[in-house]
Amino acid sequence: MSMVYINIFLAFILSFMGLLIYRSHLMSSLLCLEGMMLSLFIMMTVTILTNHLTLASMTPIILLVFAACEAALGLSLLVMISNTYGTDYVQNLNLLQC
């Protein structure tokens, strides 16, 4: 396993640990999720380029599309919660249920 893979895996683990530690605020959770998506994108791209997998070359682009959709939904939820309650606590998400 090369140093590139180790560093990318370490970035993923640090983002995941940040998600577990800072889960009370929505903005921190969204930033950690974006870090996880970025490390997954880089790992998939490096793996595809080193193994010359031409059939799977579209997979990182699809991952970026899903990451952009996730970020847009998360930011819209963050704006709605912060306008309604004035904070970005995740515990306010339970109040949005019908």
Swiss-Prot record:
Protein's job: Core subunit of the mitochondrial membrane respiratory chain NADH dehydrogenase (Complex I) which catalyzes electron transfer from NADH through the respiratory chain, using ubiquinone as an electron acceptor. Part of the enzyme membrane arm which is embedded in the lipid bilayer and involved in proton translocation.
Entry protein name: NADH-ubiquinone oxidoreductase chain 4L
Pfam families from the UniProt entry: Oxidored_q2
Gene3D superfamilies: 1.10.287.3510
Subunit structure: Core subunit of respiratory chain NADH dehydrogenase (Complex I) which is composed of 45 different subunits.
InterPro entries: NADH_UbQ_OxRdtase_chain4L/K, NUOK/Mnh_C1-like
Domain of life: Eukaryota
UniProt-listed Enzyme Commission number(s): 7.1.1.2
Keyword Translocase: yes
Membrane topology: Multi-pass membrane protein
Biological process annotations from GO: ATP synthesis coupled electron transport
GO MF: NADH dehydrogenase (ubiquinone) activity
Family to which the UniProt record says this protein belongs: Belongs to the complex I subunit 4L family.
Keyword Translocase annotated: yes
UniProt KW keywords: Electron transport, Membrane, Mitochondrion, Mitochondrion inner membrane, NAD, Respiratory chain, Translocase, Transmembrane, Transmembrane helix, Transport, Ubiquinone
Classification of source organism: Eukaryota, Metazoa, Chordata, Craniata, Vertebrata
GO CC terms: mitochondrial inner membrane; respiratory chain complex I
Parts of the chain that traverse the membrane: 1-21, 30-50, 61-81
Location relative to the cell: Mitochondrion inner membrane
Reaction(s) catalysed by this chain's protein: a ubiquinone + NADH + 5 H(+)(in) = a ubiquinol + NAD(+) + 4 H(+)(out)
Protein's organism: Martes americana
